[in-house]
Amino acid sequence: MYLATTTGTSDTDRIAGMVKNAIYGIIAAKADGIENPTVGIANIDGARQTEKALLKLKEQGYDINFAESARADGGIVMRGNDLLAGTPDIMVMDSLTGNLMMKIFSAYTTGGSYESLGFGYGPGIGDGYDRLIMIVSRASGAPVIAGAMEFATNLGSIPCVSSLRCLIRDSR
């Protein structure tokens, strides 16, 4: 599962950031070989507004394949059990929640002493980015660094993302 989050660089507005994170997550998953990735939104502050914006993008023709929560009531907004079960291919989060989840999932096997699972914090995708940016941290262990290098190789070069500002603005 891809955790679609940033370090706060996608946008200073939580909702706009989460919408962009969804788009960037779709780009990363497709570039990594998933042809039609499913998207879920973590049940956090801003989830319903993000859902509304993404549904509007879909209505306007942007190709988004939404996941269905495993819970009996279903829906696009995912709960904790969906996160643990890997229900969507892409889980959309804000920067704070996403950073927390990245750290928990990557370091839980070591008791938090270093990150032993995952593929790093990349790629950096955004409006006007013309190169692939992959990120690891000083807490990243050798397995995460190796995973990040493998992920970067799989992604090759992500096509330039054009005019996301208009896409986000028009979805509101």
Give the positions of each predicted feature.
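Glycine-rich phosphate/diphosphate-binding loop of Rossmann-like nucleotide-binding domains
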Residues: 11-70
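Glycine-rich beta-alpha junction loops
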Residues: 8-10, 43-48, 70-74, 94-98, ...
